[in-house]
């Protein structure tokens, strides 16, 4: 079972003005996202998830992806 990838917003460039730059794959999930999903950094790394300790944002789509992944692991019989 493939672990989910973190999705983060691209940096906003001043020369482009107020245009939304979109999203991209991130380095890992933030500690806040892990906490909302009920995990800590050590447990997340054991489950094969990447953790980015520098990032402070909490994106709802990442929290939802983590919750779905944990649910699939529990259905497969993995202790979370």
From Swiss-Prot:
HAMAP family, alphabetically? Answer: Ribosomal_eL13 (MF_00499)
Top-level division of the source organism's lineage: Archaea
Q: Which family does the UniProt entry place this protein in?
A: Belongs to the eukaryotic ribosomal protein eL13 family.
Alphabetical list of InterPro entries matching this protein: Ribosomal_eL13, Ribosomal_eL13_CS
Gene Ontology biological process terms from the UniProt entry: translation
Pfam families the UniProt entry points to: Ribosomal_L13e
Gene Ontology CC terms, in alphabetical order: ribonucleoprotein complex; ribosome
Q: What is the protein's given name?
A: Large ribosomal subunit protein eL13
Where would you find the membrane-spanning parts of this chain? none
Q: Tell me one GO molecular function of this protein.
A: structural constituent of ribosome
Q: Which N-terminal residues, if any, form the signal peptide?
A: none
Q: Keyword NADP, does the record have it?
A: no
Could you tell me the keywords of this UniProt record? Ribonucleoprotein, Ribosomal protein
